[in-house]
């Protein structure tokens, strides 16, 4: 086995007992978070549907999703959902946003009552427009819901590089407890009781990451990139306010922080998708980009709620094939002039 060794031991949290943490999802982010939980001193099980992924993790690697990173022993991987959830103290849901409902439906009968379920995916459900926390509350009403979000690439977390995220729950005490239990030497977890704000920031930044990638791919320049990200954040705040998100949450790690990271690196699937789009290359075969379904949903929400969100609308129209990038730029640049802060 080759690759960069990743230790399963780091630092446990003083005064916090070890938990049995179950991770639902064997992709790059699920595997990275499993390693992070291991470093925080917890016993970790990982559920993946793909038997090959389960076998690979058992052999200390996940070449399909985290190539080049050797995973130290300690993560118990399984494709048996009942075994994965048995005796769990906490569950991290790391399946794609559009698959969450189906995953929870499968997990429902084996989910221990009362344990927290932490959302680690970012998005809005395509068919219903529901935030992911609403799906959890519908399917698992006896399990408190939380969300982990912030500027974090899977490879960085898997390698144990310094990273800061936020853990949010409506119950402030639960959020603080989860943040303390998840934190380790190079993973700093802040807490928040603004669950909706954290979810909105994480979902919408994916749309602007596609736009950022398209701007770069089309060669529109650094000035256009900066303008798009800045005005995109204005739209994020507008939609966040309509959902009741607090402004300070959107200015934090899960909003502005994640937006800056995702809009500046091809490590982001959404940026990479937009980059390919801007270059005029074929999109077939690219990894899942959550911003694609989210763009259409966010554009619809903006229209329904009377929110001015021209960048989101442009991204949705480009992805739908209704307009070209050039046409979108012209439309955005010729909008009626206004005061910058007139929201």
From Swiss-Prot:
Any matching Pfam family: NAD_Gly3P_dh_N
BP GO annotations: carbohydrate metabolic process; glycerol-3-phosphate biosynthetic process; glycerol-3-phosphate catabolic process; glycerophospholipid metabolic process; phospholipid biosynthetic process
Enzyme class of the recorded protein, top EC level: oxidoreductase
Subcellular location: Cytoplasm
GO MF term (any one): glycerol-3-phosphate dehydrogenase [NAD(P)+] activity
Active site: 205 (proton acceptor)
InterPro entries named among the record's database cross-references: 6-PGluconate_DH-like_C_sf, 6PGD_dom2, G3P_DH_NAD-dep, G3P_DH_NAD-dep_C, G3P_DH_NAD-dep_N, NAD(P)-bd_dom_sf
UniProt pathway: Membrane lipid metabolism; glycerophospholipid metabolism
PANTHER family: GLYCEROL-3-PHOSPHATE DEHYDROGENASE (PTHR11728), GLYCEROL-3-PHOSPHATE DEHYDROGENASE [NAD(+)] 2, CHLOROPLASTIC (PTHR11728:SF1)
Role: Catalyzes the reduction of the glycolytic intermediate dihydroxyacetone phosphate (DHAP) to sn-glycerol 3-phosphate (G3P), the key precursor for phospholipid synthesis.
Membership in a protein family: Belongs to the NAD-dependent glycerol-3-phosphate dehydrogenase family.
Protein name: Glycerol-3-phosphate dehydrogenase [NAD(P)+]
């Amino acid at each position: 086995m080759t690759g960069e060794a990743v230790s399963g031991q780091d630092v446990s949290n003083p005064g916090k007992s070890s938990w049995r943490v179950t991770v639902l999802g064997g992709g790059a982010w699920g595997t990275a978070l499993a390693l992070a939980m291991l470093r925080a001193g917890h016993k970790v099980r990982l559920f993946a549907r793909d038997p090959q992924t389960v076998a690979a993790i058992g052999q200390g690697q996940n070449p399909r999703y985290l190539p080049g990173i050797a995973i130290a022993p300690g993560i118990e991987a399984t494709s048996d959902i009942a075994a994965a959830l048995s005796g769990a103290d906490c569950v991290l849901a790391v399946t794609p946003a559009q698959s969450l409902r189906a995953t929870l439906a499968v997990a429902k009968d084996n989910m221990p009552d009362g344990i927290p379920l932490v959302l680690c995916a970012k998005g809005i459900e395509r068919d219903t427009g529901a935030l992911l926390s609403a799906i959890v509350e519908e399917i698992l009403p006896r399990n408190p819901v939380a969300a982990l979000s912030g500027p974090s690439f899977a490879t960085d977390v898997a390698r144990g590089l310094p990273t800061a995220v936020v853990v949010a729950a409506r119950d402030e005490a639960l959020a603080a407890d989860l943040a303390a239990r998840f934190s380790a030497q190079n993973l700093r977890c802040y807490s928040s009781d603004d669950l909706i704000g954290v979810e909105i920031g994480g979902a919408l930044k994916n749309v602007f990451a596609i736009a950022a990638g398209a701007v770069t791919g089309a060669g529109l320049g650094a000035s256009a990139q900066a303008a798009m990200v800045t005005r995109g954040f204005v739209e994020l705040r507008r939609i966040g306010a309509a959902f009741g998100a607090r402004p300070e949450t959107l200015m934090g790690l899960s909003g502005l922080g994640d937006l800056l990271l995702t809009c500046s690196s091809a490590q982001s699937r959404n940026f990479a998708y937009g980059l390919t789009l801007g270059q005029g290359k074929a999109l077939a075969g690219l990894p899942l980009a959550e911003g694609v379904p989210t763009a259409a949903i966010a554009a619809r929400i903006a229209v329904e709620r009377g929110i001015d969100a021209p960048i989101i609308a442009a991204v949705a129209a480009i992805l739908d094939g209704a307009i070209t990038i050039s046409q979108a730029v012209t439309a955005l640049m010729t909008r009626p002039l206004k005061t910058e802060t007139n929201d």
